[in-house]
UniProtKB/Swiss-Prot annotation:
Name of the protein in its database record: D-amino-acid oxidase
Keywords carried by this UniProt record: FAD, Flavoprotein, Glycoprotein, Oxidoreductase, Peroxisome, Signal
Residues holding FAD: A10, I13, K34, H35, A45, S46, G50, N52, R305, S332, G335, Y336, Q337
Co-factor(s): FAD
Position of sequence motif Microbody targeting signal: 359-361
Binding-site list for (R)-lactate: Y242, Y258, R305
InterPro entries: D-amino_acid_oxidase_CS, DAO, FAD-dep_OxRdtase
Post-translational modification summary for this protein: The N-terminus is blocked.
Highest classification ranks of the organism: Eukaryota, Fungi, Dikarya, Ascomycota, Pezizomycotina
Localization: Peroxisome matrix
Industrial or biotech use: Capable of converting cephalosporin C (CPC) into 7-beta-(5-carboxy-5-oxopentanamido)-cephalosporinic acid, an initial material of different beta-lactam antibiotics.
């Protein structure tokens, strides 16, 4: 069954959705977006991601991340030009953080003491207490992937174009404006809304349960492996600590912050100093023992994760008698690691509403 589809948004969620939809050669797909791979803008979260695959969902909601893991694993093994590589990941937990998360009702599976993903990662193991960073109570490690977003996003766009997807730049004030933007010259019967944080103010959506989860990072030339992710830090309420070395010379990401509701787009030098100081304390070899002065900074950056109070929104909505909307937004900090699983869900919904629309003709 063929559909005329306009995908609004060209971040990792929009492009992955377009790619999987394009596998049906009957679909006529147009991607429209204000920002494209190669752009660096605080509104465009995807380039600022680490990015990696560190499961965050509960086991009951884990299917999106499970499906995506196997696709990223395939890309490492078969498509090296995608900019994804295997990298060992070390997770460090503090009991105070995990207990707080449990009380809040929003536990992060990544820091669970009995994580569901221990059976997904073949070499998963709990660390011996002697391996755990001072100040943390327990840890685990496994081989995951790290993604060079500067390579991966253009690769993803190229795969879409290879499959016949047409890409346009546009700024939409209302989701309904996408009805006039199909390259096929006719009204699309389906619009995929993959605008991320843009859904907060996009007319026709205006989802006020959306908010930025501000992330500040430092990108350095220094190399360091394995990846490091911690459940929390002693100082700085919105501060977290992580490190990941991107594939193919993409630099090493030092983080960071997870500050829900903070719209500040400029890097804070005090936060930057805290980020770097923490990293050189737990991983002094990254700077050859020279402390912060031994870090070769490429840039300081801020990205806005598309946080949503009730989690990701993937559902269909009737716009009018001609067109349906399929929403795919609100992924917060796990857009990459849920991208393929969520896109598969989008394909299912597109098939569902496409059949429903045609049955009424």
């Amino acid at each position: 069954m063929s559909n005329t589809i306009v995908v609004v948004g060209a971040g990792v969620i929009g492009l992955t959705s377009a790619l999987l939809l394009s596998k049906n050669k009957g679909n006529k797909i147009t991607v429209v977006a204000k920002h494209m791979p190669g752009d660096y803008d605080v509104e465009y979260a995807s380039p600022f991601a680490g990015a990696n695959h560190s499961p965050m969902a509960t086991e009951e909601s884990s299917e999106w991340e499970r499906r995506t893991w196997y696709e990223f694993k395939r890309l490492v093994e078969e498509v090296p030009e995608a900019g994804v590589h295997f990298q060992k990941s070390r997770i460090q937990r503090r009991n105070v953080d995990t207990e707080k998360a449990q009380r809040s009702g929003f536990p992060d599976a990544l820091f669970s003491k009995e994580p569901w993903f221990k059976n997904m990662f073949e070499d998963f193991r709990e660390q011996h207490p002697s391996e755990v960073i001072p100040g943390y109570d327990s840890g685990c490690e496994f081989t995951s992937v790290c993604i060079n977003t500067a390579i991966y996003l253009p690769w993803l766009l190229g795969q879409c174009i290879k499959n016949g997807v047409i890409v346009k730049r546009a700024i939409l004030n209302d989701i309904s404006e996408a009805k006039k933007l199909s390259h096929a010259g006719k009204t699309p019967n389906i619009i995929v809304n993959a605008t991320g944080l843009g859904s907060y103010k996009l007319g026709g959506v205006e989802d006020k349960t959306m908010a930025p989860a501000r992330g500040q990072i430092v990108v350095v030339r220094n190399e360091s492996s394995p990846m490091l992710l911690t459940s929390g830090v002693e100082d700085g309420g919105a501060d977290v600590m992580y490190l990941m070395q991107r594939a193919a010379g993409g630099g090493t990401i030092l983080g960071g912050t997870y500050d829900v509701g903070n719209w500040e787009s400029q890097p804070d030098p005090n936060i930057a100093n805290r980020i770097m100081q923490r990293i050189v304390e737990v991983r002094p070899e990254i700077a050859n023992g020279k402390g912060v002065k031994g870090l070769s900074v490429i840039r300081h950056a801020v990205g806005m994760r598309p946080w949503r109070k009730d989690g990701v929104r993937i559902e269909e909505e009737k716009l009018d008698d001609e067109t349906w909307i399929v929403h795919n937004y609100g992924h917060s900090g796990w857009g990459y690691q849920g991208s393929y699983g969520c896109a598969e869900n989008v394909v299912q919904l597109v098939d569902k509403v496409g059949k429903a629309a045609k049955s009424k003709l």
